[in-house]
């Protein structure tokens, strides 16, 4: 699996969200590459890895990334957070975990009320079969909904998406299945490495309340929470400086 490597310093793995590719992290890469060696992952079926045979499944993807990277901090945005969290729960080489607009359980359950209804993801899966482009555009709009800079972020996401190979319908449906049916709350309870959880105050896809609830599950004393005021689901586009400072501070404090 192809992983782009850039920069110099302590290793940081970055994993993107649904339908996107690692180019979405450009605002962070610009500031972090002077201080960190960045491993920019395109998930199977996405971007530069659009032809890889690795299944879009947690253990397969995590194993492939781990085989190509040194001990590192793992950052996952949105869907990418599930892969980063699974890695942190199963691999000793994960020095720290950064969950960016990501939660161990993306859908509402009886004992997990601060999340979206599962129908959001199942409906997107159905709509993909009818109109691929319109469905992608609606999801990107949901990514930016509520953000102080929603229109600017939406333009950026559309440009970024089209800069590399776009994933096919089967790949996108596999990602939606992960979002709809994965529950890694037990992994949070048992976390060994320190973790930083970043929420967008105005995120409509992963409400800040769900990330706050996730941090309450994590071991006390090694868990940090940052809420980006005015941020939506992609706060690294609108608040890159604040994000960069938070990431660098967290990584600098790791043992």
UniProtKB/Swiss-Prot annotation:
A Gene Ontology term for the protein's cellular component: membrane
Biological processes, Gene Ontology terms: biotin biosynthetic process
Class of this enzyme: hydrolase
Keyword DNA repair annotated: no
Active-site residue list: 78 (nucleophile), 203, 233
Coarse class of the protein's main subcellular location: cytoplasm
Subcellular location: Cytoplasm
InterPro entries noted in UniProt: AB_hydrolase_1, AB_hydrolase_fold, AB_hydrolase_sf, BioH
Domain of life the protein comes from: Bacteria
GO MF, one annotated term: pimelyl-[acyl-carrier protein] methyl ester esterase activity
Keywords: Biotin biosynthesis, Cytoplasm, Hydrolase, Serine esterase
Subunit structure: Monomer.
Family: Belongs to the AB hydrolase superfamily. Carboxylesterase BioH family.
PANTHER family listed in its UniProt record: AB HYDROLASE SUPERFAMILY PROTEIN YCLE, MONOACYLGLYCEROL LIPASE
Protein name from the UniProt record: Pimeloyl-[acyl-carrier protein] methyl ester esterase
């Amino acid at each position: 699996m192809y992983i782009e490597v850039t920069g110099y310093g302590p290793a940081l793995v970055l994993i993107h969200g649904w339908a996107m590719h690692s180019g979405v992290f450009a605002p962070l890469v610009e500031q972090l590459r002077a201080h960190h060696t960045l491993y920019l992952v395109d998930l199977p079926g996405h971007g530069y890895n659009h032809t890889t045979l690795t299944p879009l499944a947690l253990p397969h993807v995590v194993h492939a990334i781990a085989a190509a990277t040194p001990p590192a901090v793992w950052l996952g945005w949105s869907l990418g957070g599930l892969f980063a969290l699974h890695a942190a729960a199963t691999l000793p080489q994960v020095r720290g975990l950064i969950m960016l607009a990501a939660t161990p359980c993306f859908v509402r359950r009886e004992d997990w009320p601060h999340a979206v209804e599962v129908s959001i993801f199942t409906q997107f899966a159905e709509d993909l079969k009818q109109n691929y482009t319109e469905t992608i555009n609606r999801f990107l709009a949901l990514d930016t909904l509520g953000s102080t800079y929603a229109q600017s972020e939406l333009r950026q996401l559309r440009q970024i998406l089209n800069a590399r190979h776009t994933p096919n319908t089967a790949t996108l449906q596999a990602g939606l299945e992960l979002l709809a049916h994965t529950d890694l709350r037990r992994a949070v309870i048992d976390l060994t490495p320190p973790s930083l959880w970043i929420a967008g105050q105005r995120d409509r896809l992963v409400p800040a309340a769900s990330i706050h609830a996730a941090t309450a599950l994590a071991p006390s004393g090694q868990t940090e929470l940052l809420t980006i005021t005015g941020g939506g689901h992609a706060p690294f586009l609108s608040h890159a400086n604040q994000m960069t400072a938070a990431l660098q501070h967290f990584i600098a404090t790791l043992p």
